[in-house]
Design a protein with these regions (language model features):
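Basic/polar, cationic surfaces and motifs that engage anionic cell-wall
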Residues: 99, 104-201, 213, 217-223
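A glycine-rich, coil/turn loop motif that links secondary-structure elements
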Residues: 202-212, 228-235
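Extracellular LysM carbohydrate-binding repeats and other cell-envelope/extracellular binding modules
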Residues: 224-247
């Protein structure tokens, strides 16, 4: 399958090549900057020490910034299951969007069409499992909110790009804001750790604060129309359904 890209290489990557089988993950990001040109400047500035493999513009054009077999600097401090520092074994895709700090907005249809095409190409090329297609906030719960609650995870999952639950929406919504017991809340967090979210709490952050961020990261991906940082029966049911899919 031919993939049409524009070349605009970033100097920010590790010099040592990796091998095909090291590439196990795709990580989605939004740029989180006021405009597209600023984002491109930052990703190609040697002093910024950040980059990605692919950049998707508002008009759907795909820019290749780092060759796949080199490690781009997009994930930062990160964790998923038993993997740390996911730069080593992932492909990073940045999608132009101002993000939560600059007027977060819906991704364009052209962006999503290109993302679909690019993801399918990478999945086939590197035999990447749907379970290993993640958002930046999945792997860096305390630091990141991207790609955020406007990112079309459910739509992408229908094309085997990422995982989504298989619960009936109407039935599920009836459980929204219904409180859980302490035991059920513990069960919810255990489900998240089984899915892959990190158990490790930074020394600088209280357990309560970390768990609140963790709930929000989960909601931004799987319960996108209400991010309140609270566990309810709806969240619990979704987590139970997902555990089966991630194992």
């Amino acid at each position: 399958m031919a993939l049409k890209t524009i070349l605009n290489y970033s100097p920010n990557f590790n010099g040592k090549k990796r091998i095909y089988k090291q590439i196990k993950f795709i990580i989605f990001h939004y740029t989180g900057m006021k405009n597209e040109s600023n984002a491109l400047k930052r990703l190609t500035d040697i002093q910024s020490e950040v980059s990605c493999h692919y950049f998707i513009k508002n008009n759907g054009e795909i820019i290749k910034m780092v060759p796949d077999l080199y490690i781009a600097w997009h994930a930062g401090e990160s964790s998923w299951k038993n993997h740390k520092s996911l730069n080593q074994n992932s492909i990073g895709i940045e999608i132009t969007n101002p993000g939560h700090e600059h007027g977060y907005k819906k991704f364009t249809q052209k962006q999503i069409t290109s993302l679909l095409r690019l993801s399918k190409f990478l999945i086939k090329e590197y035999k990447i499992s749907p379970k290993n297609i993640l958002g930046h906030s999945d792997i860096a719960v305390l630091r990141k909110r991207d790609p955020g609650e406007k990112f079309p995870w459910e739509y992408l999952s229908k094309n085997k790009i990422g995982i989504w639950h298989t619960l009936n929406k109407k039935e599920l919504k009836k459980n929204r804001k219904i409180k859980v017991s302490m035991r059920e809340e513990d069960f919810f967090f255990n489900n998240l750790f089984k899915i892959g979210y990190s158990k490790k709490i930074s020394k600088n952050v209280s357990k309560e604060r970390y768990l609140n961020y963790l709930i929000e990261a989960f909601q931004r991906r799987y319960r996108q129309n209400l991010i309140d940082g609270k566990v309810d029966q709806e969240c619990l049911l979704i987590s139970q359904n997902l555990v089966k899919k991630f194992h």
